[in-house]
């Protein structure tokens, strides 16, 4: 008996009462090489369709592939950073299938002899605890082309009037990183999935092997999910959810799929082994095609390529190129700055850590740099619908703003106006201040005293309270002076003048 694909969902707590969530994560990473995996075609993102192709990546008769050595180096460095064993003898294999996104009707991948095996990645969960995710393998392969389905309601082939194919991406170097089964996480399974992809993205970014842009497809996550009845030993039927294009979506997709599968099982149905597509708009998954097995792909060794046999000396040479890894770097910076675990987690979760570090390196204090990036600039990024690092302002420019505040030329309120001018493309903060002298903090005590006297005269009751020793009442007068000077006064200096005027 099978059930409707989308029965009434169970609450996640109801799922956990009867089932153990089981995960497996597959992450495809496009390598940032200049040319494709097996040919000299460029890999520029966003080029006109079918302008970065040649006989090799189109699979024309007589064309022969040549391995991109830079891609192999990147794959080995990824394996080393994931604590994997690097194979002394690996081979490419043909993965045969008949989808139009690969014009050869096969994909050159690795099957039973991958470049890296048996590693792990320790990830930090929201409460600061560590979870070890074991890595089964990391293997090299070529990417597929892109299909654009025209018409229909979802942009997928169902209901489309026709499809367009762009083979620019076909042959771009990929590393696929596959975890071992992730079980025992219970209620935290979706969180573990998100934390793993987050940590992996940070690691790959630090290695400088990919730009890991999930929104552009250079890092793509597939989440395998199944449910195992409490006390059982046999794994349930798994589904593979694709089209998970953000860190938040990883957690949402896994949680939804667990709830959906439980509802199917509780309704007396069977979970179908299939690929499913994540729908960003409503956080659900929809059915795709039935999931193939390895036998369906009829793997066999690639006859046109020699085995990959990295020497121990080469592997150790590449190990020496590994940078300070993200978790080591974070621990060092946390100690240097003297901030809490919670503050560091917030910076990482906001994708602000690298920006704050660069701002500090440009001369700002850690506290000031952090405050700008996680508050006002984060608000601006959210308003514009972009990532924090995509804002048109650099860490050096933020450091300039901090320096202008420290020098007394700007206060915090006016500094935000300066930042707005920078975001509008009007130049560096110092240039903005030069072009807009009205933004500079008023330092003329004569003018400030006149504004203070006027505010006190307009508020005699408050003036009397201040004279009677109630200094806190000065806040109202300070606020009035700030309004009168359009925010250009130094609040601390204004308060001093208010107290002086009241005989304090």
Swiss-Prot record:
Signal peptide: none annotated. Transmembrane segments: none annotated. Its EC number is 6.3.5.-. It comes from the Bacteria. Pfam families: GatB_N, GatB_Yqey. InterPro entries: Asn/Gln-tRNA_amidoTrfase_suB/E (IPR017959), Asn/Gln-tRNA_Trfase_suB/E_cat (IPR006075), Asn/Gln_amidotransferase (IPR018027), Asn/Gln_tRNA_amidoTrase-B-like (IPR003789), GatB (IPR004413), GatB_Yqey_C_2 (IPR023168), Gln_synth/guanido_kin_cat_dom (IPR014746). It is an enzyme of class 6 (ligase). One of its GO terms (biological process) is glutaminyl-tRNAGln biosynthesis via transamidation. PANTHER family: GLUTAMYL-TRNA GLN AMIDOTRANSFERASE SUBUNIT B MITOCHONDRIAL AND PROKARYOTIC PET112-RELATED, GLUTAMYL-TRNA(GLN) AMIDOTRANSFERASE SUBUNIT B, MITOCHONDRIAL. Belongs to the GatB/GatE family. GatB subfamily. Heterotrimer of A, B and C subunits. This is Aspartyl/glutamyl-tRNA(Asn/Gln) amidotransferase subunit B. It comes from Rhodococcus opacus (strain B4).
